[in-house]
């Protein structure tokens, strides 16, 4: 089949192409465009008054492209629901410091956290002077996040941030996506993955195994590059 000769003459492209599949909504050559493309789908959804989630995936390498930041800025200003997955598999964009960020990440990436947050906020607003208490808590939380939580760059742009999350932990990812769907506005899920995870030859040499066609597991041969 064409899939078996992907990235070779006569085979399927390594990138989305509309003439190859009706599931490919647009033509592209690199994922620096993914957030912008997702925003287009988000805008179409909102104009049609439909309700579903749009998810764009972008790698840490693609995030170096200026188009990605233009789209992030636009995503913040639109103030509509949009999920962005940052696949961090090469470098740590925002390293954890000690165990506190890991603990806080686990807490704020759970449904129970958002249930408690909503209940406490609603209760405080009913009390005399409750609105001032809520604002004081928000300021304290913001200052604390600037000190110990990763992803502050995205938060400063007005985009909610969840993570870092182990991208190979499916159960954890499902929980985090459930939380992301409850957040109003754009949200980034920062997943940390290991390139070639689960296949030792690819783990040892991730660069050589990037974007290649199918290879034999028993007689491993890689295509040569002229």
Where on the chain are the PLM-derived regions?
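Residue-level preference for the first positions of well-ordered beta-strands
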Residues: 53-55, 81, 186-188
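Active-site flanking residues adjacent to catalytic metal/cofactor-binding acidic residues
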Residues: 59, 86-87, 189
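Predominant activation on well-ordered alpha-helical scaffold segments within soluble catalytic domains
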Residues: 35-42, 72-73, 83, 151, ...
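Cofactor-binding active-site loop characterized by glycine-rich and histidine/acidic residues
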Residues: 1-2, 6-78
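Conserved small/polar residues in nucleotide/adenosyl-binding loops
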Residues: 3-7, 218-224
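Long, well-ordered, tryptophan-enriched scaffold segments
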Residues: 90-220
């Amino acid at each position: 089949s064409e899939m078996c000769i992907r990235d070779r003459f006569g085979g399927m492209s390594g990138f989305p192409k509309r003439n190859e599949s009706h599931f490919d909504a647009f033509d592209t050559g690199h994922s620096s465009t993914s957030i912008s493309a997702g925003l287009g789908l988000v805008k179409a959804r909102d104009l049609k008054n439909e309700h579903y989630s749009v998810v764009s995936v972008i790698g840490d390498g693609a995030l170096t492209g200026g188009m990605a930041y233009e789209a992030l800025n636009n995503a913040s200003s639109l103030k509509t629901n949009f999920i962005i997955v940052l696949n961090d598999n090469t470098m740590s964009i925002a390293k954890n410091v000690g165990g506190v960020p890991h603990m806080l990440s686990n807490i704020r990436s759970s449904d129970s956290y958002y249930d408690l947050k909503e209940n406490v906020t609603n209760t405080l607003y009913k009390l005399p002077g409750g609105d001032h208490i809520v604002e004081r808590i928000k300021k304290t939380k913001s200052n604390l996040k600037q000190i110990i939580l990763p992803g502050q760059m995205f938060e400063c742009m007005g985009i909610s941030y969840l993570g870092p999350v182990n991208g190979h932990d499916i159960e954890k990812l499902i929980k985090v996506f459930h939380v992301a769907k409850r957040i109003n506005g754009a949200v980034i899920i920062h997943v940390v993955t290991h390139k070639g995870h689960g296949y030792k030859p690819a783990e040892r040499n991730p660069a050589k195994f990037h974007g290649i066609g199918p290879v034999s597991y028993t007689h491993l041969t890689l295509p040569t590059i002229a």
